[in-house]
Curated annotation (Swiss-Prot):
This is tRNA 5-methylaminomethyl-2-thiouridine biosynthesis bifunctional protein MnmC. PANTHER family: SARCOSINE DEHYDROGENASE-RELATED, TRNA 5-METHYLAMINOMETHYL-2-THIOURIDINE BIOSYNTHESIS BIFUNCTIONAL PROTEIN MNMC. Pfam families: DAO (PF01266), Methyltransf_30 (PF05430). Residues 270-662 are annotated as: FAD-dependent cmnm(5)s(2)U34 oxidoreductase.
């Protein structure tokens, strides 16, 4: 995937108030009545909302080429909203809309365009509130409390459809083939696109498009659709509609990274931190019955128990998966945290990462080379750092304006309390020692049966026979709690250097400074040495500044925790792989990848772990991804990034090279 090379739409508004693309010399919607044209062509052409009452599944999936102003989406959402309000007991409960856009509108242009349709304002305002930054890849928006999911894929549709995971094959119930006219934008209307639409269309799925161009009709027929001409809208004589009347078959492209869903709709989660809490809500939203087993007597006693944690992305130019995953995870996390109906201490004050020596300065230069939008990350000079943060460091760096800090312990407790009101059953003080396969499900401690199980228990995730070989490791660390002083109180942003320092929490007038890093260590005993080390690192990184001397650790106030990490700094999200079967089945994978079967996994056993030091950033999208996978729903990441999150990845990479797995 070409990361972040996204240009915003170059448009103007004509005398009628219709947006017009300067680059394509074409209107975004009809000057006459764009709203009625959308209802006629795309909703009517796909027999929507007539199909809503008889839809056989809880989720309807609609895909579109060319999001533009979002008119098609908003019109469909309005119709869906009216339908579910009037028909609360039908099977169809949720809408998933997937759209591709090469040139996304700027937020202000989107708002101006929406003024043309006052009747869509209730839905348009929700979209505007979550409108994402313009960088490449998938932006998942959860709207209407999660009843409507919008996946906005920014980039070239002909490239993006090649990067979709196989799990989306034959899932789309209806296609809106939209975009600028074929004569104006021939690069989009390709046989590759038509073939991708056919691959993604569910048998019996439909499509509609405003054009009646012969090459479009023939191309869609060649791809597998049954096509017919219909009367066009208004002055347009004809349009095209189609149906996928056959069942096509498509071989898996990377079967060794295949993700298996679950036929169950009942699951146990083993954990008690932020990952468990977010996953509980994501599954409950999809209609699952969920039970949480926590070994501790209260939530967030592990790595999620800190008073202040920083929210910002891990950026890397060297690893494409990191470069794709973390911006998506960071922006999704902010959207989710902002939408939560719970209270927790937090400040979106920004985070600034400093180049305090030659190595860190070089690293920041590489981060900036990712060319993320400035509202995500941008360069700052030493003078700008002083202005932004309120303290003088003498260092420049990179700032994340949308970052900040939050209280993980509060957030986790509030999320689990919210989940309990939505049906979550919680058992505290219940350590799960063993997992035993029982039919298609699992027995916990030889006692409690569940149809599916998710392991989200931090560094203890390897404590089962099924996970003992996973290449993850614990990292112990101590965070120091220090009282504020007049000079420390001036700090307005989270500072990251060879450690981190938060602004004071107004609720307790304390800062957090940390954290020590002890790979392989699970000891949570207070360490005087770590306390001193946390203070000294701040002083050493900014030797010319006086204010770091104000850090007072004499009260020995600190918290020790244990993170779970991986060598490649990415979480493990997906099926628990079957270690022995993976080594046996893929012994000759490097010689015969073309005949490989799907990845061997432990049926109905999943994991969400190895979040390392960035769990606040990665847990929301990771939980959303796993809940979608378990429910056989569209996934919010491209296939390469999904492969990089697969718990079997480190083994499979070695096997693909013919190397031994140790």
């Amino acid at each position: 995937m070409k990361q972040n090379a996204i240009q915003p739409a170059n448009l103007e508004f004509n005398a009628e108030g219709t947006p017009v693309s300067r680059d394509f010399d074409d209107v975004y919607f009809s000057n006459d009545n764009g709203l009625e044209e959308t209802r006629y062509v795309f909703l009517g052409g796909n027999r929507l909302p007539e199909r809503f009452p008889s839809h056989p599944r809880p989720l309807m999936i609609v895909a579109e080429s060319g999001f533009g102003t979002g008119l098609n989406f908003l019109t469909l959402w309005q119709a869906f909203d009216v339908f579910v309000r009037d028909n609360p007991n039908v099977t169809l409960q949720r809408l998933h809309f997937i759209s591709f856009e090469k040139y996304p509108l700027k937020a202000e242009d989107l708002r101006l365009a929406h003024q043309r349709w006052p009747e869509l304002a209730p839905w348009a305002q929700q979209l505007q509130a979550q409108w994402p930054s313009a960088f490449g890849g998938c932006h998942r928006l959860l709207l209407d409390g999660g009843r409507v999911t919008l996946d906005l894929w920014f980039g070239d549709i002909n490239e993006l459809t090649r990067e979709l995971d196989d799990s989306l094959n034959q899932q789309v119930d209806a296609w809106f083939l939209d975009g600028f006219a074929p004569a104006k934008n021939p690069d989009m209307w390709t046989q590759d696109l038509f073939s991708a639409m056919a691959r993604l269309a569910r048998p019996g799925g439909t499509l509609a498009t405003f054009t009646s161009a012969g090459f479009v009709r023939r191309g869609l027929q060649e791809a597998g659709f049954t096509m017919r001409k219909s009367k066009g809208f208004g002055r347009k004589r004809e349009m095209l509609t189609g149906e996928m009347a056959q069942t096509l078959s498509f071989p898996a492209r990377v079967p060794w990274f295949a993700r298996s869903s679950s036929d169950a709709r009942e699951a146990a989660i083993i954990g008690g931190g932020i990952a468990s809490a977010l996953l509980s809500l994501a599954l409950l939203r999809r209609g699952w019955q969920v039970t949480l087993y926590c070994a501790d007597e209260a939530p967030a006693q592990g790595a999620s128990g800190n008073r202040q944690g920083a929210l910002y992305p891990l950026l890397s130019q060297h690893d494409p998966a990191l470069a794709r995953f973390f911006p998506a995870a960071f922006t999704f996390a902010r959207r989710m945290y902002d939408a939560l109906p719970v209270m927790f201490d937090h400040q979106w004050c920004g985070v600034t990462q400093l180049g305090w020596d030659e190595k860190s300065t070089h690293k920041i230069a590489q981060m900036l080379a990712l060319n993320l939008p400035p509202d995500i990350a941008c360069a700052v000079t030493a003078e700008q750092v002083a202005g932004l943060t309120g303290v003088d460091t003498g260092c420049g760096g990179i700032t994340y304006p949308a970052g900040g800090w939050l209280c993980p312990q509060q957030l986790t407790a509030e999320l689990l309390a919210l989940a309990a009101t939505r049906g979550l059953h919680v058992h505290y003080g219940y350590p799960v020692e063993t997992l035993s396969a029982e039919g298609d499900g699992w027995l916990l401690n030889q006692q409690r049966y569940h149809q599916a199980v998710v392991l989200a228990n931090g560094h203890r995730i390897t404590g089962f026979a099924q996970t003992a070989q996973l290449p993850v490791y614990p990292v112990g660390g101590q965070v120091s709690h220090i009282p504020t002083t007049p000079r420390l109180a001036a700090l307005r942003q989270v500072l990251c250097y060879d450690g981190y320092l938060t602004p004071q929490n107004p609720q307790n007038q304390q800062h957090c400074i940390g954290a020590s890093y002890h790979r392989g260590n699970t000891d949570t005993t207070f360490s005087e040495e770590d306390q001193q080390h946390n203070r000294q690192r701040l002083i050493d990184c900014f030797p010319g500044a006086e204010w770091p001397q104000d850090v007072d650790i004499s009260a020995n106030d600190a918290r020790c925790g244990v993170r779970c990490a991986t060598r490649d700094h990415l979480p493990m999200v997906g099926n628990v792989p079957d270690y022995a079967a993976t080594l046996t089945q893929y012994a000759s994978l490097h010689e015969q990848p073309d005949i490989a079967d799907s990845a061997p996994v432990c049926r109905n056993l999943f994991m969400l772990g190895a979040l390392g030091s960035r769990g606040l950033c990665t847990a929301p999208l990771s939980a959303e991804l796993l809940a979608a996978q378990m429910s056989a729903e569209p996934l919010p990441l491209d296939s390469d990034t999904l492969a990089a999150l697969n718990p079997n990845r480190l083994w499979v990479r070695k096997l693909l090279k013919g190397k031994a797995v140790k």
